[in-house]
Amino acid sequence: MRTRAGAFFGKQRSTSPSGSSTSASRQWLRSSPGRTQRPAAHRVLAVCVRNPARPAADHPLVSTTQAAAQRQARQWDSRSKPPQLQPQLRHTHVSRQAQRRQQQQVQQQAEAGALVVPTVITSFPEHLRPEVLANGVLLVDKPPHWEVPEVVAAVQRATGADKVASVAPLDARASGLMLLCFGSATRLAPRVERAAKRYTGTLVLGGSSLSGDVRGGSFRAAQLPAEHLTDEDLREAAQGLVTAAAGAPVHGAVATGHQGGGGLALRVLPRTWRLRQLPSSTEYYEERVEPSMRTLDMELLDFRVWRESALSHNDGAAGAEYDQHDQHKQELGRGLVWTRSPPHPRPVVLRFSALLVGRSHVRSLIAMYGRRLRTAACLDDLRRTEIGSFNVEEAWPLEALVPVLQRHAH
């Protein structure tokens, strides 16, 4: 047995392309198919320190950490030419079994990362099968005063799915389109975040609030004058925001790489107050957050504003301030004309439509619009109508969806 093994290796050594050198033959035997126990050479990225003043050096110094490379650079310091840090592929030795394990892990990660187009759930009970719930998307029309976790929990209980997530969150007081992803479709979150989203709603011009919303306790309906603004002023201010986001050299614009817009994004500061909803209630309160100087990039593709005909008394918190004046008018006048004027003029209510890319900062956009008009502005009502190519008209109303899911899912 030893003779055959010796003859075999001797024959391989004699016919090796490396010649009769012992070190070359040994290196050739390490890479032979029959010697799997020997380590194999592979290439890794390391930090290489080169000294241009010493070109006669045999090999550059190599380090795997930045700190060690800097220490070696100080040792190689030269007055004429400073050392340079550059990445370089170097050889290392790992076993073939470890190489196979690494290849299998890379292949498994590639297979898991390959996103299969999910099924849009449109009919019941056909789209409630396990294979659909493992990779599906459900369009939901969220009513106001519903938290996103409440919507996700209600749908998950009704369908019995293992994994449900909302890839496009929405404020509790806002209504409109939500995307609920089942199973592996939750990998769509980065793509949905980069998609364009359209919002519609109303804003109160002249009113101010710490949170930028009329539901906050600090809201004042007519803090600054806004009745003198004409329709032309409103259109020019809205078009000015779109022009600034489209590439005009204005203060506060930074470059971004989105393909859908003009290539620039408005940079805004986050608010130090946010609006929170009381548990199991439709009331809200303002909560102070830690101030931050981190700016938020907001890409604006379209922004249109038009005047509302009149402000109803039951529409939001802006009209609630005038209910007491109307009641006092009926008690005193008994049908006669009340000569007293309210303590503040009525705020200007406008309708708007905005198309944003990335994470939505509608309150910051409304506040920025008010500053361009030399007044204040607060968000009154908000509804999301589009996410990419999805429209709210194709979504299921939540009040009608949950009973249907409970009836067909189990």
Swiss-Prot record:
InterPro entries found in the cross-reference section: PsdUridine_synth_cat_dom_sf, PsdUridine_synth_N, tRNA_PsdUridine_synth_B_fam
Location in the cell: Plastid, Chloroplast
This protein's record includes keyword Chloroplast: yes
One BP annotation, GO: RNA splicing
UniProt effect for mutating residue 141 to E/S: No loss of function
Effect of residue 171 to G/S: No loss of function
Biased composition (Polar residues): 26-35
Gene Ontology MF: a single term: pseudouridine synthase activity
A Pfam entry, by short name: TruB_N
Main localization (coarse): plastid
Annotated stretches, region: Disordered: 1-40, 56-106
Compositionally skewed regions (Low complexity) per UniProt: 14-25, 96-106
Alphabetized UniProt keyword annotations: Chloroplast, mRNA processing, mRNA splicing, Plastid, Transit peptide
Transit peptide limits: 1-46
CC terms in the record's Gene Ontology section: chloroplast
Subunit structure, as described in the record: Possibly associated with other factors required for trans-splicing.
Family named by the database record: Belongs to the pseudouridine synthase TruB family.
Reported function: Required for trans-splicing of exons 2 and 3 of the chloroplast encoded psaA mRNA (a group II intron). It is not known if this protein has pseudouridine activity; mutation of the potential active site residue does not cause loss of trans-splicing.
Name the record gives this protein: Trans-splicing factor Raa2, chloroplastic
